């Protein structure tokens, strides 16, 4: 699982870098990510929105840590 820590990033910077980071790493064969957001609910919402817009889904509290999100590809969007 690949991780990125967004502590210290502005919402604008996250909106600029995260979509490409997710897509590039997914295209390189990585299909699950831990995104460390800290406890900011607004940052979590920004990340969830970016994930949704780019075909990923983000889960809260997946490891008992409320400061990170588990991000995976949204399989319901894949048409076979």
Language-model-derived ranges and their functions:
Residues 1-30:
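An N-terminal amphipathic alpha-helical segment
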Residues 59-63:
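Short beta-strand
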Residues 64-70:
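Short, flexible loop segments at boundaries between secondary-structure elements
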């Amino acid at each position: 699982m690949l991780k990125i820590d967004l502590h210290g990033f502005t919402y604008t910077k996250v909106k600029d870098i995260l979509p490409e980071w997710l897509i590039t790493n997914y295209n390189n064969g990585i299909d699950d990510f831990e995104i460390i957001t800290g406890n900011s609910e607004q940052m979590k919402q920004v990340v969830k929105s970016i994930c949704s817009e780019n075909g990923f889904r983000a889960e809260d509290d997946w490891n008992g840590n409320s400061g990170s999100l588990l991000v995976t590809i949204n399989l319901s969007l894949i048409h076979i």
